[in-house]
Every structure is written in structure tokens, then in C-alpha cells.
Amino acid sequence: MAKGPVIVITGTPGTGKSTHAALLANESPVPLRHINVSEWVKERELYEKYDEEWQTYTVDEDRLLDDLEPLVAEGGLILDWHTCEAFPERWADLVVVLRCDHTKLWERLEARGYPLKKIQENNEAEIMQVVLEEARSSYAPEIVVELESENMENLESNVTRIGGWITTWLKNQESS
Ligand SMILES: Nc1ncnc2c1ncn2[C@@H]1O[C@H](COP(=O)(O)OP(=O)(O)O)[C@@H](O)[C@H]1O
């Protein structure tokens, strides 16, 4: 059986990456392992330090990439992270960038208990489409897809659409 693709799901924090990844892992036509990269970094202590001011970890990217490389080689992976430019271009078969209206995003981050400064920073990043630009400058345009993640209907249709893409990808792998 063909191994599964490597799908990067990225977007500003709160856009719905983990929600999409969990549903996709459940509904995918081929088994996919969901790696929440932020959690992975914490669990495996792949960071240099904890930044108190921003309440985030400064990731040790070299160690992170070494750690993920064997999993990527196996395939069948969802990499869920708020940034994507650190990953080697060859890793990704598909890069999904989730987008959300900034007032909705603000509410989601507030509900998460983020400090105001962090909400403002992320909100601004979403308005300026920082993650989308990052994805577009790091990967071939044909593998980058921008999807709206504002409501449950978006969530369901996005996951169905990515599932359809996986089915085609598998067929292409078999015939090549
Ligand atoms: N498409 C969506 N429609 C409605 N709520 C969503 C959607 N995507 C995410 N959410 C909600 O927004 C919050 C943040 O989602 P999450 O998946 O944790 O975001 P991320 O992983 O990008 O930080 C959660 O409460 C989740 O239920």
C-alpha cells in the first residue's frame, strides 16, 4: 500500500489547525498521524528557553527537524504548526493555510486566556496574512491552499476537500 502524504496545516494560532487536523486524521482515506508541533516541542523539550514575556517557547529548530525527519520519511503525517517556513520544502505534499476573520480570531484567543499583547500580535499577523505569505514564499504555489475556517460548515467542507485531495494523491502515487 502506498504511504500517505505529508500535509502541513498552518495558520495563525486560533484559526483551527488542531481542530482540522483531528477531524482529518479521523476521516482520511489513509491513516495519518497528527503531530501538534507546539505540543511535541514541549513534550520532547525541543526548545532553547521559555520566553516569560510572550509566554512561548523558543524552539530549537535544528533538533526539531532532526526529530521529525524519520516520521516524515515514513509519510502519512499531519504537521500542525503556526509557522511552516522552518520545514524543508521537500517535506510537504500539501500546505493548508487556515484563515479566519480577525474579530472571530480575537474572541477565540481571548477564550483561550491569551494575554492581551499576544492576542494583539496574532490578530495583526492574521490581518497582514503573515502565515500565508510565509507559506507562499516557502513552497511551490500549486501545493499551497488557503482555506477559510470561520464556522463548522467551513471545517467540514475543508476536511472533505483535503480528503478528496488525498484520494487523488494516492491514485497518482500508484500510477507513477
Ligand atoms: N472552523 C471553525 N468553526 C468554528 N470554530 C472553530 C473552527 N476552527 C476552530 N474553531 C474553534 O476555535 C478554537 C481554536 O481552534 P484550534 O483548532 O485549537 O486552533 P489552532 O490549532 O489553530 O490554534 C477552538 O475553540 C475551536 O473549537
Predicted regions span which residues?
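Phosphate-binding P-loop
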Residues: 1-4
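NTP-dependent small-molecule kinase module
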Residues: 106-107, 114, 136-176
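ATP-binding Walker
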Residues: 15
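P-loop (Walker A) phosphate-binding loop of NTP-binding proteins
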Residues: 12
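Walker A/P-loop
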Residues: 18
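Hydrophobic anchor at the beta1->P-loop junction of P-loop NTPases
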Residues: 9
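A glycine- and Lys/Arg-enriched "phosphate-lid" helix/loop adjacent to the NTP-binding pocket
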Residues: 49, 99-143
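ATP-dependent small-molecule kinase phosphotransfer cores
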Residues: 30-87
